Amino acid sequence: MGLFGTNYNKEGKGVSKDEREKRRIFAFFDEYGRKFGALIKANILYFLTILPTIAGVILTGSEYKVAGIVLLIIGLFTFGPLTSAFTYIIRNYVMQSHVFLFSDFKEQFKINYKISLPLGIIDIIFPMVLIIAFKYYLNIGGMVAVIAGGIVLFAAVIFLIINFYAYPMIVTFNLKLRHILKNALLFAIVKFPVNLFILIIDGAIIYYFAMQFLSFNRLGFIISLVGFSLFALSFVAFVTVFTVWKYIEDAMIEEDEEEESVFKDSI
């Protein structure tokens, strides 16, 4: 499968596939361990900034629905840009580039606001539409409902995977959003087995802490709060960017460099 998809150690003669796999895994944990403290800081910053969006999602289904809707509206205008800023920080950690956490986060929020705003809106609204559609087909029953529900579920998986690639491309390339989404969709399909594996890892972590919160007991709430506020978000992001960055780099960055080299030679 090519776990995490990186090649920090180049593949050469005499190196088995299993050995390369081990090197990739070791490289991931080595990088994550060295950046652990910085990732906690980035996690706290991102968690605090998207907290209104999280609260909005939770409260819209409660007796505080009006407050939830207000917070959700705020989230519509901030979630995408905040996520792009967070992704920039994580990408730089993966690339082993220096990061000025607060200033870089603020700067990237401003720089990528326009292009990441619509993606953030899609990220909030589209899952709601999928959930409504899935519940509808679940209730009507029958084979048609099963097939339709399967299609909705597959669409949700592809949608989540597209985000793996869209935000790193937003903070790296000067492309229009439709081109970013097109490329992200191609990556989602071409690298589907690896993407699905990473989605399962990410989903398991988020699901665990979400279930702790929904347990409605004090210990569960504390576990959920500590997990989400300190490391869950940055760990999921680091796993994802560490995996997809090599694919983006190989397919888009090296290609751009080759085209630039040809252009210079022709001059």
PLM feature segments, named:
Residues 1-135, 144-145, 162-164, 169-267:
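Helix-coil boundary and N-terminal low-complexity module in membrane systems
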Residues 139-140:
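Short helix-loop junctions at transmembrane helix boundaries
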Residues 147-159:
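Alpha-helical transmembrane segments of multi-pass membrane proteins
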